[in-house]
Amino acid sequence: MSPILINMLLAFTISLIGLLIYRSHMMSSLLCLEGMMLSLFILTSTLALTMHFTLMTMMPIILLVFAACEAAIGLSLLVMVSNTYGLDYVQNLNLLQC
């Protein structure tokens, strides 16, 4: 395996571990999710370039679109929860249920 692939897999793993450890605050969870999406974007981009798949060249762009949508929805949810409750704890999201 090339060092770039190892680094991207390590970055994804560190972001996943960070998501599991720092899950109490919503902002840190969103940052870890963004780190995971960025490492997946770089990983799919390098795989598409090294494998020379013509059908796989659109995959990084699609992944980037989903990452932007996820970031927008996550930030709007963070603003809504922090304006309503004054906190960004993930435990307060259970209060949003009917």
From Swiss-Prot:
Gene3D superfamilies: 1.10.287.3510. It catalyses: a ubiquinone + NADH + 5 H(+)(in) = a ubiquinol + NAD(+) + 4 H(+)(out). It comes from the Eukaryota. It holds the Pfam family Oxidored_q2. Its main location: mitochondrion. GO terms for cellular component: mitochondrial inner membrane; respiratory chain complex I. It is a multi-pass membrane protein. It is found in: Mitochondrion inner membrane. One of its GO terms (molecular function) is NADH dehydrogenase (ubiquinone) activity. Its EC number is 7.1.1.2. Keywords: Electron transport, Membrane, Mitochondrion, Mitochondrion inner membrane, NAD, Respiratory chain, Translocase, Transmembrane, Transmembrane helix, Transport, Ubiquinone. The chain crosses the membrane at residues 1-21, 30-50, 61-81. InterPro entries: NADH_UbQ_OxRdtase_chain4L/K, NUOK/Mnh_C1-like. GO terms for biological process: ATP synthesis coupled electron transport. Belongs to the complex I subunit 4L family. Core subunit of respiratory chain NADH dehydrogenase (Complex I) which is composed of 45 different subunits. Core subunit of the mitochondrial membrane respiratory chain NADH dehydrogenase (Complex I) which catalyzes electron transfer from NADH through the respiratory chain, using ubiquinone as an electron acceptor. Part of the enzyme membrane arm which is embedded in the lipid bilayer and involved in proton translocation. This is NADH-ubiquinone oxidoreductase chain 4L. The lineage of its organism: Eukaryota, Metazoa, Chordata, Craniata, Vertebrata. The gene is MT-ND4L.
